[in-house]
Amino acid sequence: MNTKIFNRHFSPRSCAIAVGMALGIALLSGCGSFMRSDFEPPALAIPEQWQNTTVNEQVKVDPWWQQFHQPELDKLVSQVLSTNNDLTLATLTLRKARLQSGLTRDDLYPQLSANLGASRNQPLDGGDATKSYQANLSVSYEVDLWGKVSANIDQAQWAALASAEDRESTTQSLVATTASLYWQIGYLNQRVDLSQKSIAYSKQTLALTQRQYDSGAVTQVNVLEAQRSMAGQEAAHSQLIQQLTVAKNALAILLNQAPAADPAQSLASGETWVEIKQLPDVAVPDVSVGVPADLLVRRPDVKASLYQLRSALASKDATYASYFPSLSLTGGVGESTSELKELLRNPVGSLGAGLVLPFLQWNQMQINNDIADIDYQTAVVNYRKTLYSAFEDVDNAISAKQQYRYQGDKLAQQFSAAAAVEAIYESQYRNGAIGVQNWIDAQENRRSAEAALLENRYNQLTAQATLYQALGGSDIAPPLAKE
């Protein structure tokens, strides 16, 4: 006959007492808040006036790419933000940081554990076998006497916030890169089209020169000059084709596609966008902007640097607190009710108490505290550097926008004059007044002026995008899916 022996038994009352014990221990937390360092923003030398500043209207830049009123660009940006690998990696990093923050926060509360066991004993003399069952519920808790646990929680939370801003910074960069590639493809398509027209025009020039040579009107040198000009244009045309291929491949990578895929035909959403064949002939959005310091604080890289600074300060506090005595309380529930009463009457005496005295490791403590302080000072320098770089980015972007606009006006005048000179030389050559080289040179000058004007148009668009990115703006990153 088998006999069952229960070494541990829990009643509902016992479980309630155990839960009450855990809650009581939790009230001991927070005793070390007095050891936290107060955050003081680093001193910054911010200029009273900017070199390139006009103050007229409130800046609104989000979503800034829509200010160009190009539906195909809007569609492309949306697709990149939903498929790009860099943004996916940044999202995974953010999720990991948030999970780590949650794990750290759990250290504030008592940790419960339970185990069940069973054994069977069979006497060698053939007597009755016995079975026994064991059940234990234990509680462990580190009292946050000096704020170490709280500092670790702060460090993890600030790190998670910094990770969120890193993701937003990745988003801002992706949008700017997408817009730049979109316009670059349009610019190169337009250059390729102009190049094809110029080659066809050069062929006509060569044919005309050949006929004149055959009739004895010009020398062979004129024919060779026309051939040289056409060969140079064909070589330049090949280079443009290569640049266009590189731009399309770069866009395919942004869209999470293999290189050589046609971005216009294989969007993951099933939509298609019409590849831009020329730069948009619309006015570049005008942003009249004063740049106060608080405007740049919204930039994700600046916010991330600030959060990293706060995280470093909390880490410094945690390192400092880790060398103060730490008190760990452990208790087990599974005995008689009288033992539970004793535990609640005198918790520190009844619970297992482990007192660790790390401050005895004096040399190691000093070194680790110095390392933590250096990490904090490094974060201060990085924050100051990031903010100053933000001011530099905006100042440079405003200057570039202004100078490209000025250059555009002058290049338009240059193209107009070059086209007029070409027409005059063509007429003179056809009438036999000048040699073919003068006409060929005029053609080259006109082509160069037209290419420079087109490139300036591309530069104005990208400079505007760079300014929008430098200003930061509100968050544009896609929201995270619910965990």
Where are these regions (language model features)?
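Transmembrane beta-barrel architecture of outer-membrane proteins
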Residues: 73-75, 132-134, 180, 225, ...
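Amphipathic alpha-helical coiled-coil segments
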Residues: 89-104, 170, 174-197, 201-206, ...
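Metallo-beta-lactamase
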Residues: 240, 300-301, 307, 456
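Small/polar (Gly/Ser/Thr/Ala-rich) solvent-exposed segments
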Residues: 108-130, 140-169, 188-191, 267-269, ...
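Intrinsically disordered, glycine/charged-rich N-terminal periplasmic/extracytoplasmic linker segments
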Residues: 71-117, 131, 138, 142, ...
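Hydrophobic, lipid-facing positions within transmembrane beta-strands of outer-membrane proteins
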Residues: 133-139, 291, 349-355
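Terminal intrinsically disordered/low-complexity segments used for targeting and assembly
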Residues: 2-6, 15-19, 25-82, 157, ...
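Repeat-solenoid scaffold signature
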Residues: 214-243
